[in-house]
């Protein structure tokens, strides 16, 4: 295992890369479609119908490219989460295993965002054109996106963000405290194994709630929706644990108010 002087910078570099990628992902999924950053090609009249688009190589080629990028990201994200791969990376990278996973995921997502090919000439599933929808629908989408991202950031902070990013593992190792997950209860570990993406509903809102849903955005939303759905396996025990934890936190938050009332 590398000395602490090397572990800490490596974990911080992974965190900075992930943070920058997260900011770029907000721009890619929200700011660009909501603020008109996707290049147009003559407006709605220049778009083809669905049957014509499915026979047009100039539309199918970028869609196939985008699909390849998404499969690359999903493949990396799933492969490195497999138990055998995690055991191998833990053997050679130790406490940096999670940081390595986060860094590779960020790099794969960077590839998706940087080389994504829009399809402005393709058909759209829906589009807000006529007034007042052309004004109010983008505004409503913007508000929902802002709320969703605020919820995402709040949930990540509550859901042991430092452990998810790999920082806590290195911090505990340097202080000789062992593995962070080893200190959690069996019910918490069970929940974490079922729910490593604790922001599913909010991400789905960001992916689907847009003023214009074109072919490339539809591909992005569909594939990530399927992946998020398959990555979640909550059952009744998990829900009971979440409900108990929520009630416990609310009880703790209400204690100062009870003291003041007395």
Swiss-Prot record:
Keyword tags: Membrane, Nucleus, Transmembrane, Transmembrane helix
Ranges per topology, Nuclear: 1-4, 81-97, 165-191, 235-262
Location of the protein in the cell: Nucleus inner membrane
Residues that span the membrane, as ranges: 5-28, 59-80, 98-114, 134-164, 192-210, 217-234
GO cellular component labels: nuclear envelope; nuclear inner membrane; nuclear membrane
Coiled-coil regions listed in the entry: none
Keyword Membrane set for record: yes
Keyword Lipid biosynthesis in annotation: no
Membrane topology: Multi-pass membrane protein
InterPro entries for this protein: Nurim-like
Top-level taxonomic group: Eukaryota
Regions of this protein lying in the Perinuclear space compartment: 29-58, 115-133, 211-216
Family membership: Belongs to the nurim family.
Protein name per Swiss-Prot or TrEMBL: Nurim
Primary gene name: NRM
